[in-house]
Amino acid sequence: MRFSVVETFHGHRGRLGNICGLRIGTGEQCLDTPTCLLYTQAGSAPHLTRDMLHKLGDVENLPALFPLPPITSFVDSVMQFGKGLGSFVALQSHPSFIRIQDPMVTTPSGFNDKAGVSVWDQGGRVHLNPLSFTRMMEAFQPTCYQALCDSDTPQDASRKRLQRAVDRSVSLLDQCLAMKADSSCLQHSAILGSVQGGYNRDFREISAKETAKRDVDGFVIEGFHVNGPQTKSLKFEEVAEILEEVIALLPQDKPRFLHGVLRPEFILKAVLYGIDIFDASLAHAATEAGCALVFNCSSDKDLELMLGRDLLDQELEMDMKNARHREDFVPLLESCACYACTNFTRAYIHHLLNTGEMLGQVLLSLHNIHHFLGFLKSIRKFMVQHGAKELNGN
């Protein structure tokens, strides 16, 4: 996996970039950044078949995020299958990225130790050490995976907990790197190191410097939250200063990831601070809540508004279970060209959700993913246009 910076911008660490060498099967793909990873659960985009997913157009080759917890239960089957995770779940056209925890599920606290990290699948707790984890990765053969790390650092974490998270994450990374180097199955898989330290600048600096010394292909900024839909309440201003300091310590020639159910204004500001890749879990969180994403993001003026203030909840999403939509015979979003908006009304989707019909969540998923991907496309366009203005001194 090779990352190159296409353009940087005066006054910001934000950049347009390109990732090449993303291995899928015997071929390779490239990816423009900033962007996001398609969110999956148990190997599929929730509520959507592959054919329905690909009706979204630009999504066909979008890299997919596979949270580790819901896929640990079928690792033996994937191993016997012998062709890797992407082919096993019929998403072989999507580069596969494996993350240790699920951004949609709150991570229980207090279950990591110096030997390894705990995740939770349908059967309960699974404790992973570097050896068992590497064997899983050999079965899954991902395009890219996050090394084991201890990200159990809620906002009220003690200095002792932060110290352990930093020390353990570096130790686990070293072990994962050594085992990857000895594995013939993982020679073409990229590996990501994680920057820990919670909200403590000293620990963040130690973690960033130590992780940057390792031979990793990119960096995941971890430890600002413990995952789950409640992450949406995190304000960018709470992490801005620490994030800026961390980014300054990381090399320019490697991508930076930040995962979680993050609001659009958080994502936009994080891009300007130098984050390259997010995930689309916000779209899934909205669907699970019975909501349609409706925030305006198609114009420069819309994005400038996000930089100036936080969106109101009613500006972000619309509750489609609300009775006021019973006779609302317009699309979810008038300007949207997705399958749901071009064929169905708010009234019908409201009816589907309130009668428990699966089609309701299918249509919401199609709309929310389409809208979220359009948002990332608007950010790239915004950066191109405003970068040119800044570089020209206008």
From Swiss-Prot:
The places in or outside the cell where this protein is found are: Cytoplasm
The record's disulfide annotation reads none
Principal location listed in the UniProt entry: cytoplasm
Record-linked InterPro entries: QTRTD1 (IPR028592), Queuine_tRNA-ribosyltrfase (IPR050852), TGT-like_sf (IPR036511), tRNA_ribo_trans-like (IPR002616)
A Gene Ontology BP annotation from the UniProt entry:
tRNA-guanine transglycosylation
State whether keyword Magnesium applies: no
The keyword Ribosomal protein is annotated on this UniProt entry = no
The record's GO molecular-function terms, alphabetically, read: metal ion binding; tRNA-guanosine(34) queuine transglycosylase activity
Name the residues that bind Zn(2+).
336, 338, 341, 367
Note describing how the cofactor binds: Binds 1 zinc ion per subunit.
Q: Which cofactor does it need?
A: Zn(2+)
What are the protein's UniProt keywords? Cytoplasm, Metal-binding, tRNA processing, Zinc
CC per GO annotation: cytoplasm
UniProt family annotation: Belongs to the queuine tRNA-ribosyltransferase family. QTRT2 subfamily.
Relate the assembly described in the record.
Heterodimer of a catalytic subunit and an accessory subunit.
Under the heading NCBIfam families, the entry gives: tgt_general
Described function:
Non-catalytic subunit of the queuine tRNA-ribosyltransferase (TGT) that catalyzes the base-exchange of a guanine (G) residue with queuine (Q) at position 34 (anticodon wobble position) in tRNAs with GU(N) anticodons (tRNA-Asp, -Asn, -His and -Tyr), resulting in the hypermodified nucleoside queuosine (7-(((4,5-cis-dihydroxy-2-cyclopenten-1-yl)amino)methyl)-7-deazaguanosine).
Looking up PANTHER family in the UniProt record yields:
QUEUINE TRNA-RIBOSYLTRANSFERASE ACCESSORY SUBUNIT 2 (PTHR46064:SF1)
Identification of the protein by name? Queuine tRNA-ribosyltransferase accessory subunit 2
